[in-house]
């Protein structure tokens, strides 16, 4: 009975997968489409009203300069701006520019009528966001009014900001254009990332030493000693730091350690390097509505992977088509304009 049930379940799952699979005949790849842009930032503050105009200009630059966005075919292109801000992000002095996401929805036309509007294929990139373009930032808790001492609110938040401001950086591959750096997640993986920046400014990311990380870990854990577990973690941290040599403490920090589990870093160049965003990168003589850095997901599937994607989905991998049509040199040069005014 169990074997029969398992067989029936497998047949049902296979049928569902086949039913959900898409084929090219489901779409109208040659039907002309249209471009639209909308702003999802709802704040009525003056800086956001000004910023919305800057981002609209940027969106229009993409519309005018990327062929598949200028003359959509097989889909309507719905571009949307999404804001992203929170009080802890703004507390960090390395975060100056207002951050935003610009999303492109490829609303494919169905051969049976209508178009794909709910979670269609899409691509997005980030503007002025220091938490993108690299590995994920940590998520150490900030002050909790239900658990923490009110007198420690400022100290706890400052310690958490420092802890959460350190991130692992993917391997640098090359500079594809002045002001455009390419990183890859792994040597055998297609996900890549681009950072578009002003090369006349100081480095956007700066390394941290093992000692710096040891100090900010101590600052954080010494503020959290209410429970026995908190005290055990602090004691373990102090033990781990004592086991590090002076040479390793002064070395650049890399992610991972064979034995330590609180201060999980090493100075032996093993793993991804740890860095933080450089506060000096920002040109603070400009308003915080200016565009000073952008980060892009940059997929580069090989032909076999692209063919498999097309077979499984019935449509091209639009993200890769899009990034391969962007004029990266021109985009980097326009970075110096900051407001992307359209001439």
Where are these regions (language model features)?
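Bacterial Sec-dependent N-terminal signal peptides
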Residues: 1-22
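Functionally constrained cores in energy, signaling, and assembly domains
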Residues: 11, 15, 158, 185, ...
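Cleaved targeting-peptide boundary
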Residues: 22-31
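Residue-level detector of beta-propeller blades
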Residues: 31, 35-37, 330
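Short, solvent-exposed recognition patches
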Residues: 36-283
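Intrinsically disordered, low-complexity regulatory segments enriched in Ser/Thr/Pro
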Residues: 121-134, 138-140, 284-313
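Surface-exposed amphipathic alpha-helical segments
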Residues: 303-343
């Amino acid at each position: 009975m169990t074997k029969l049930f398992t067989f029936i379940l497998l047949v049902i799952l296979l049928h569902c997968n086949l039913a959900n699979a898409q084929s090219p005949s489901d779409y109208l790849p040659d039907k002309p489409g249209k471009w639209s842009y909308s702003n999802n930032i709802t704040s009525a503050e003056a800086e956001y009203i000004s910023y919305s105009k800057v981002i609209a200009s940027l969106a229009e630059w993409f519309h005018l300069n990327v062929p598949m966005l200028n003359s959509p075919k097989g889909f309507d292109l719905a571009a949307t701006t999404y804001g992203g801000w929170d009080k802890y992000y703004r507390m960090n002095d390395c975060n100056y520019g207002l951050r935003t996401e610009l999303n492109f929805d490829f609303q494919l036309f169905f051969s049976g009528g209508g178009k794909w509007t709910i979670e269609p294929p899409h691509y997005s990139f980030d503007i002025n966001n220091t938490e993108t373009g690299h590995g994920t930032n940590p998520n150490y808790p900030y002050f909790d009014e239900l658990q923490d001492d009110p007198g420690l609110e400022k100290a706890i938040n400052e310690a958490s900001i420092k802890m959460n401001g350190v991130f692992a950086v993917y391997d640098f591959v090359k500079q594809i254009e002045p002001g455009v750096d390419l990183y890859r997640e792994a040597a055998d993986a297609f996900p890549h990332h681009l950072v578009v920046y002003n090369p006349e400014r100081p480095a956007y990311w700066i390394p941290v030493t093992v000692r710096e990380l040891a100090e900010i870990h101590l600052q954080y854990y010494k503020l959290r000693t209410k429970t026995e577990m908190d005290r055990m973690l602090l004691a373990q941290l102090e033990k781990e730091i004592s086991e590090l040599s002076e040479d390793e403490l002064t070395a650049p920090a890399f992610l991972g350690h064979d034995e330590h589990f609180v201060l999980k870093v090493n100075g032996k160049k093993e793993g991804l390097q740890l860095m933080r965003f450089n506060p000096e990168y920002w040109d603070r003589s400009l308003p915080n509505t200016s565009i000073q850095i952008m980060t892009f997901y940059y997929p580069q599937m090989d032909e076999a992977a692209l063919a498999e994607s097309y077979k499984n989905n019935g449509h091209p991998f639009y993200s890769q088509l899009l990034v391969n049509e962007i004029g990266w040199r021109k985009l980097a040069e326009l970075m110096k304009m900051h407001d992307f005014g359209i001439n």
